[in-house]
Amino acid sequence: MDFTDLIDLASERLGGAVLVANDDFFAPKENLLKLSAPIFVEGKYTDRGKWMDGWESRRRRTPGFDWCIIRLGLPGIVRGVVVDTSYFRGNYPEHCSIDGASFSNLPTEQELTSDTVQWVPLLPEMPLAGDSQNPFPIHYEERVTDLRFKIFPDGGVARLRVYGEVVPDWDQLKRAGGYIDLAAAENGALVLSCSDMFFGHRHNLIMPGRALNMSDGWETKRRRGPGHDWAIIKLGRPGQIHRVEVDTSHFKGNFPESCLLEACNATGLPAETLTDLSTAWTTVLPRTKLQAHTRHFFDQELLDAGVASHLRFSIFPDGGVSRLRVYGTLAE
């Protein structure tokens, strides 16, 4: 799996934030994590210069570098980053680097910028190209909560995407009691693959909160032949399923006629084997009719599938679903 198929741990929709920057004279640091793709507006200026959709520092006249500190929305293991310099052509940094740190608490800005923080190099100083997507794999196997992003010597970056595997605090989740959403992104779940995601990304299924609109769900193209669409989800931890929610909010003329939820215990198996016909799936929710723009809750209808590590969520024949919630208990 390419690292860009993983969750963006720093996404602002997941709570990621640029806490502090040493300089954002031309364009604010908050732009760095915006969900939308960067844009360019010809002829748009502010009282400080050309308006740019990114983070941009002033021209450096002394030796050094510029930096910002980012709190990840979801702590985890970083597998790769994309440094997007779109529209920064004569004002992009020559190089960048990234350090990481892990905190059990929420340090203040003053604490994060002090010399006491033990920053670990995740990405050494690497050259950047202007007006480009600059992908870099990361090889560090520890959980990270915060990043320090350095640009050399100065300039502008449109977006920073930080892809990785979410590592939740399971002890804290257990102490909270009750059922855990095993299919939630914040609990380490991941949509490994799907048949189609023409109109809406598969990861939207497991994002926190309610969908903002139709684009914030998983939606497939119109099916013109036989068959149906599906998504395969790796649960955050194996567990037993007790309650399911299928939310079709915002999907009114394009919701699926019905859905089916199946499970298997494939811990340790390669993800690509889950699409093999030989994989034995057990029904959790039999094929059930759905309604438009509705939150559907199922508990009595569920069948006992034992301990599950992965799910196959099928929709018939096509359409869109905003969110899938799968509540259960962790396997011992």
Describe the predicted segments one by one.
Residues 1-67, 87-230, 239-240, 252-332:
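Trp- and acidic/polar-enriched beta-sheet ligand-binding modules for extracellular glycan
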Residues 72, 235-237:
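A short glycine/threonine-centered beta-strand motif
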Residues 76:
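Active-site-proximal cofactor/substrate-binding loop regions of enzyme domains
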Residues 79-80, 157:
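Short, well-ordered alpha-helical microsegments
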